[in-house]
Amino acid sequence: MSYTKLLTQLSFPNRISGPILETSLSDVSIGEICNIQAGIESNEIVARAQVVGFHDEKTILSLIGNSRGLSRQTLIKPTAQFLHTQVGRGLLGAVVNPLGEVTDKFAVTDNSEILYRPVDNAPPLYSERAAIEKPFLTGIKVIDSLLTCGEGQRMGIFASAGCGKTFLMNMLIEHSGADIYVIGLIGERGREVTETVDYLKNSEKKSRCVLVYATSDYSSVDRCNAAYIATAIAEFFRTEGHKVALFIDSLTRYARALRDVALAAGESPARRGYPVSVFDSLPRLLERPGKLKAGGSITAFYTVLLEDDDFADPLAEEVRSILDGHIYLSRNLAQKGQFPAIDSLKSISRVFTQVVDEKHRIMAAAFRELLSEIEELRTIIDFGEYKPGENASQDKIYNKISVVESFLKQDYRLGFTYEQTMELIGETIR
């Protein structure tokens, strides 16, 4: 090997700032993994980094992990490899870190051969996708009746802090009818990862679940990669013909990690501090789920943290425009103790009409109309204008309030079949 070629393959860092390294490496690609050695005389690998951009003839890398122990004598060596993750049935019941490695097991499952797959895959072509025509039943009354999901749909769960996103996600895992569940906890607190693992240990579905995590203390690139890894694992089980449910909590923290990486790579902020590349990257992740003609499906649920109780956040607006529907959680309903705190009038499933029959559509429309009338009556009551006995139609609506609220509430331990849900909504609107 020539001396010049050797220099292009090894480099010292020009700058180390937090998780970001700048170097003079030239023969590398975006997404490539580089090993970091302690020094030129040592082969010990002390860290790894991922190429995230190029700027002013410099290559910018983001550390996988932290920068503790690195120095000017640190040597950066390209590997010509990209991040891969473990996949396979042996992953069921496992906890997976942002490197795609199993770190723990919460269920004893089949120890079959572990395979490796790239994490940043292209979405399926339109010609490979199957139409969404079959309902994905969640066991949650308000969703299955008013916001019916379809196999292969992508739904957003939008809420401000403290509205019960994790509560709803646990209900979806416990009561929905998927074959495999892949849960990605992105940028969450370490306590929440511990609580989720403990929850899964006691779940009847633990042997069909995979948990991928990157807590808030992990580097930005780790948090991004954890979302890719969770999706790649779901894709593997889809190719095996399974009906997969994918949960990413939260998509907002994934987007913030993208923002941090992009800003560190020298991009300029645009919409609300987010560089343009963040909005380019979102569809590449969100378009990967779906139902395939070859068999198998990924039905995905993404939690989105709102800054307040509306959709003014540009990130939330962008995500809502990409997904196939959204479930809006209301702080007011949560404060009243109504769980799941779903605001049915602000929520929508864009495949609803494709997966339910005419009778179901009529009943759902009647319930929404009743719910809207109740909201109007609440305003009249708040102004002190309602007097029982003066208006028969208002009295009829008033007498329905407790029945409607009872339907919208649900104990997290209870799941309802489709038949039970439709019977209950029929009784409510009768």
UniProtKB/Swiss-Prot annotation:
Oligomerization increases ATPase activity. Monomeric forms exhibit low-level ATPase activity by forming short-lived oligomers with active site contributions from at least two protomers. In contrast, oligomers exhibit enhanced ATP hydrolysis rates that likely result from multiple preformed active sites within the oligomeric complex. Oligomerization is important for both enzyme activation and T3SS function. Keywords: ATP-binding, Cytoplasm, Nucleotide-binding, Plasmid, Protein transport, Translocase, Transport, Virulence. GO terms for biological process: protein secretion by the type III secretion system. It catalyses: ATP + H2O + cellular proteinSide 1 = ADP + phosphate + cellular proteinSide 2. Transmembrane segments: none annotated. Disruption phenotype: Mutant is defective for assembly of the needle and secretion of the translocon proteins IpaB/SctE and IpaC/SctB. Amount of the needle filament protein MxiH/SctF is greatly reduced. T3SS effector protein secretion is reduced in Shigella strains coexpressing wild-type and inactive Spa47/SctN. Belongs to the ATPase alpha/beta chains family. T3SS ATPase subfamily. ATPase component of the type III secretion system (T3SS), also called injectisome, which is used to inject bacterial effector proteins into eukaryotic host cells. Acts as a molecular motor to provide the energy that is required for the export of proteins. Required for type III secretion apparatus (T3SA) formation, proper protein secretion, host cell invasion and virulence. May play a critical role in T3SS substrate recognition, disassembly of the effector/chaperone complex and unfolding of the effector in an ATP-dependent manner prior to secretion. The core secretion machinery of the T3SS is composed of approximately 20 different proteins, including cytoplasmic components, a base, an export apparatus and a needle. This subunit is part of the cytosolic complex. Forms homohexamers. Interacts directly with MxiN/SctL (stator protein) and Spa13/SctO (stalk protein). Can form a soluble complex with Spa33/SctQ, MxiN/SctL and MxiK/SctK. The N-terminal domain is required for oligomerization and ATPase activity. The six N-terminal residues are necessary for proper oligomer formation, though their absence does not entirely preclude oligomerization. The extreme N-terminus is also required for interaction with MxiN/SctL. The N-terminal domain, not ATPase activity, is responsible for localization of Spa47/SctN to the injectisome. The binding of ATP induces a conformational change of a highly conserved luminal loop, facilitating ATP hydrolysis. This is Type 3 secretion system ATPase. The gene is sctN.
